Amino acid sequence: MPQSSRFAVFGIGRYGTQIALALASKGAEVFTFDSNSVRSENIKDSVSLAVTLDATDIRALKTQRVQDMDAAVVAIGENFEATVLTALNLLDLGVPRVIVRSNGEHQQRILSSLGVKEILTPESEVASVIS
């Protein structure tokens, strides 16, 4: 990964936090976004910028210049509607690389049909490590 890589991570639960911290430890410039201000506050010292916002609002994303990121990771785990809307917003804004978390095969199919090329499925990742 080039030193100047700029990543946006949406959804700072356990999974999103681990992704953000791993990227930051490799020298990436990491910007985190979550609708929960406590989560943003908890990670702010470990990333370049932590913002509390509603990622389903494309205007809010534009104010944060998300379209200038090299890649975005949507790690929202419990609200698939928010995942879909955030992914669509990022695709519409022209973010070059959009990586989205899914919770199973049905969600993968939906995300693929929307044009998402990189889909993470934590459960499958764990299963492949164990087997």
Give the residues covered by each predicted segment.
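Cytosolic regulatory regions of ion transport systems
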Residues: 1-131
